[in-house]
Amino acid sequence: MSGRGKGGKGLGKGGAKRHRKVLRD
């Protein structure tokens, strides 16, 4: 899970934005 959030570039814009918000929270 952590790797996916940090690797937003590979996932894309939608995935990266969603993961970033979750990590910050």
Curated annotation (Swiss-Prot):
Residues 1-25 are annotated as: Disordered. GO terms for molecular function: DNA binding; protein heterodimerization activity; structural constituent of chromatin. It is found in: Nucleus; Chromosome. The modification N6-acetyllysine is found at residues 6, 9, 13, 17, 21. Residues 1-14 have a biased composition (Gly residues). Residues 17-21 bind DNA. The modification N-acetylserine is found at residue 2. GO terms for cellular component: nucleosome; nucleus. The nucleosome is a histone octamer containing two molecules each of H2A, H2B, H3 and H4 assembled in one H3-H4 heterotetramer and two H2A-H2B heterodimers. The octamer wraps approximately 147 bp of DNA. Core component of nucleosome. Nucleosomes wrap and compact DNA into chromatin, limiting DNA accessibility to the cellular machineries which require DNA as a template. Histones thereby play a central role in transcription regulation, DNA repair, DNA replication and chromosomal stability. DNA accessibility is regulated via a complex set of post-translational modifications of histones, also called histone code, and nucleosome remodeling. This is Histone H4. It comes from Medicago sativa (Alfalfa).
